[in-house]
């Protein structure tokens, strides 16, 4: 078997990062990425919505048709939630749960031995999916080769204990499990030594970091430890729930400029009645007060969020309240999701389930408000100085640009010429010139 592989990732940034770690793991073992003619195909799935499940099923069928001889492995959250449904599709060789992804090289080897020595007509997949609720220790996908990028993701936590009434994630990710503090520090040292200037702390519920650790560590403790490391230019925080902003965390954000002025704080609904029905345990007033306080401490902070529309029982009056509340927050970006009914969650059996047409119509209306807010936020940086961390060279309409992000996570494009020096991985002072679809076109200061 030629050691060529392709990997397809669905879902959140954590899942994307885990997919990157999987690719690095296989590369470190002598495998080569070859998307055109792979002998191994890995599909790293998401199951947060029914649409995500459907996309994964469609991709499985298409890739099996296109690559009938390849070993096809399906892993991740959908595999964890319903391995039997995936097996029923046909053509899947390996199914691995969330925790078993790190064992994929072993599973591929075992499957190939099994196929060689036993009945070639046996179409049953090799399945390894452990009960996620029993997991008590953080496991990361260990990869020896660290990719040379300007930004690196450090997964510090997995799992969630919130059990919001609409959410399947605690059922497929399990309880909160934290990367031990010293391991987080050592992994960050390796990333900085490899040239990464920005570290992004990621996880499913990073505000709960340390809850399971024996020494009482928490997210502020970890942040303070990482900020002592030489070479760390930016520290970006992943998604943090509103209730997880302790006084210590707020003080750190105010005092430490290397913590990026970019906070993703899930809202989920802008109506108190809906928030209560979701089991979110805060009010719109508390959320607004948090944003107001953080914005006063660092005025140019980009606040981003997630919002669900069409939750069971959401009336037009509830939605109108949510629409007005989101408009008032003036957030830098909002990810809008129509509610997706997930079997096994309390919301799936709630009365007053809304039609897809109502959910789609409300999502479109809220998206327009969110885009207006985002454009106003970006506009204020035209003519202002920003720091661009160069990430990659891109071609757009025949022109070359250095693409990267500012500390407040604006997507920036710097036009390049043939004489432009090598700028990837460098931190550059730039000035905003004009808006483009996703961010700002900039020039060197």
Where are the regions a protein language model picked out?
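Short flexible coil/turn linkers enriched for glycine and charged/polar residues
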Residues: 147-150, 160-161, 259, 269, ...
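Contiguous mid-protein beta-loop-alpha structural module that forms a pocket-lining wall or clamp
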Residues: 314, 326-331
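Terminal RNA-binding accessory module
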Residues: 349-445
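Conserved SAM/AdoMet-binding glycine-rich loop
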Residues: 72-73, 81-82, 193-316
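Short, solvent-exposed loop/turn segments at secondary-structure boundaries
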Residues: 52-54, 175-180, 210-216, 277-280, ...
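Proteins enriched for Cys/Gly/acidic motifs involved in redox and nucleic-acid/cofactor modification
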Residues: 1-209, 224, 248, 263, ...
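Glycine-enriched alpha-helix->loop->beta-strand junction motifs that scaffold or abut catalytic
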Residues: 91, 254-261, 329-332
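Residue-level signal for inorganic ion chemistry
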Residues: 42, 77, 104, 201, ...
């Amino acid at each position: 078997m030629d050691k060529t592989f392709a990997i397809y990732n669905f879902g959140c940034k954590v899942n994307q990062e885990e997919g990157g770690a999987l690719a690095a793991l296989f590369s470190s073992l002598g495998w080569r990425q070859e998307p055109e003619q792979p002998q191994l195909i890995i599909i790293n799935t998401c199951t947060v919505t029914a649409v995500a499940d459907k996309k994964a099923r469609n991709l499985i069928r298409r890739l099996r048709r296109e690559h009938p001889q390849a070993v096809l492995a399906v892993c991740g959250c959908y595999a964890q939630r319903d391995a039997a449904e995936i097996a029923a599709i046909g053509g899947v060789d390996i199914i691995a749960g969330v925790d078993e992804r790190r064992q994929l090289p072993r599973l591929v080897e075992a499957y190939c031995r099994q196929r060689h020595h036993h009945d070639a007509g046996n179409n049953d997949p090799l399945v390894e999916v452990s009960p996620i609720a029993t997991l008590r220790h953080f496991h990361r996908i260990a990869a020896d080769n660290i990719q040379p990028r300007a930004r690196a993701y450090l997964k510090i936590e997995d799992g969630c204990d919130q059990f919001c009434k609409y959410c399947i994630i605690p059922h497929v990710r399990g309880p909160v499990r934290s990367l031990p503090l010293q391991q987080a520090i050592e992994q960050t040292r390796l990333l900085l030594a490899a040239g990464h200037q920005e570290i992004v702390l990621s996880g499913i519920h990073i505000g709960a970091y340390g809850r399971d650790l024996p020494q009482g560590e928490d997210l502020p403790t970890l942040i303070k430890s990482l900020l002592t490391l030489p070479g760390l230019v930016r520290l970006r925080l992943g998604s943090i729930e509103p209730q997880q902003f302790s006084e210590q965390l707020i003080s750190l954000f105010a005092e430490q400029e290397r913590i990026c002025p970019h906070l993703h704080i899930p809202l989920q609904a802008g109506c108190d009645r809906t928030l209560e029905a979701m089991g979110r345990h805060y009010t719109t007033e508390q959320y607004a007060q948090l944003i107001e306080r953080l914005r006063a401490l660092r005025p140019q902070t980009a606040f981003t969020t997630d919002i669900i529309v069409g939750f069971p029982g959401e009336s037009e009056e509830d939605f109108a309240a949510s629409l007005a509340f989101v408009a008032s927050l003036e957030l830098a970006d909002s990810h809008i999701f129509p509610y997706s009914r997930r079997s096994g969650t309390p919301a799936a059996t709630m009365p007053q389930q809304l039609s897809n047409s109502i959910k789609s119509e409300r999502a479109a209306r809220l998206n327009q408000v969110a885009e207006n807010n985002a454009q106003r936020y970006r506009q204020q940086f035209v003519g202002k100085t920003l720091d661009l961390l160069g990430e990659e060279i891109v071609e757009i309409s025949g022109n070359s640009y250095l693409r990267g992000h500012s500390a407040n996570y604006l997507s920036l494009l710097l036009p390049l010429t043939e004489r432009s020096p090598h700028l990837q991985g460098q931190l550059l002072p730039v000035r905003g010139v004009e808006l483009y679809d996703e961010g700002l076109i900039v020039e060197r200061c």
